[in-house]
Every structure is written in structure tokens, then in C-alpha cells.
Amino acid sequence: MNKLESACYLAEADEAPFDKLHEECGVFGIYRADSANKSVVAETYHALYALQHRGQESCGIVVNDDGVMKAHKDNGLVTEVFTRDALSKIHEGTMAVGHCRYGTTGMHSRSNAQPLLINHQKGAMALAHNGNLTNAAELREQLEKNGAIFHCTSDTEVIAYIITQERLKCGSIEQAVLNAM
């Protein structure tokens, strides 16, 4: 490779958006066995507020209260989505996951706000994701050909669908995630 070819190759590599780590989105998770002393909702809210420089398009929180999951998410800044009134309506639990989105795939819409909450035969799963699934279009097309119905345009839903498929075949969520990889 001569110097010109080398320079062109490097320029092309620099333009490739998914070959390096990027700062996109903010993701936070918390588990507290004893939720009587501190609020997982408040801690998740404060974490998202601190992380919102990583994504100001939309945000959301899913709380798990003994297997019952509730979500609150919308477009906007953390302080716009999680008003005092909205926060007071979110039930406490022992686990929560929060996400603030910097959209790199999918449209700017409420349906693409994360975490996604997926209900299936073996229960429910909340999923938040930072980054891009580089083969999302191909996987989505394959899943749709096999009957999958998608509710948003985010690549996170592709990941959620694959993990859910694996979860229905195995004994634990941990094994399902490993199988999906």
C-alpha cells in the first residue's frame, strides 16, 4: 500500500462510525435488598440527572417490585420527564434501571425511549442499551421474516427480542443473555 492509499484507508476508517467506542446514552442500574431506607426511584432519578449530558433526547426508569415491573419514560430532559408529580406516581421496588437517550438509531419518538419493558411467557424484562448494534438491520429483517413484530425502530428492541427468544428456551435470564451473545 502506497502513502496515498494508506491515507485514504485511514480517512475511511476515521469515518466509520461504529468501529470505535463512543459516548452515547447514559445507563444506570440499582439493586437494593432493603428498600425501606432509601428510594431506588430517587437514586435512579439523580443518577440520570448526572448522566443526562450523555443523552438529552428522552429518558426513562423501570422499577421492579417483587417481579412486577412498571415503566415511566418520555421524550425530553430528565427534569421534564420526571416532574415531582411523575416521580410520586412511580412505585418503589428493590431494583431499577434508568436510561437517558442520545439517539443514534431509530426515530426520535416516545416509543424509542428506554428502558424497554418486555413481557413474555416467563415474566418480564427491562432492557437499556448504550451504543449501536452494527448488524441490527439484518437481524431485524431475519426476525421479522420469522414473525417478529416490532413496536419501535431502536436496535435495542432487536437485542430484547433475541434475549427473550433465548429466555423462553432456557432456565435463567443470565443464561439467556449469554446465549444471545
Name every feature range the model reports, one short phrase each.
Residues M1-M181:
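Conserved short alpha-helical segments that host acidic/polar catalytic motifs at enzyme active sites
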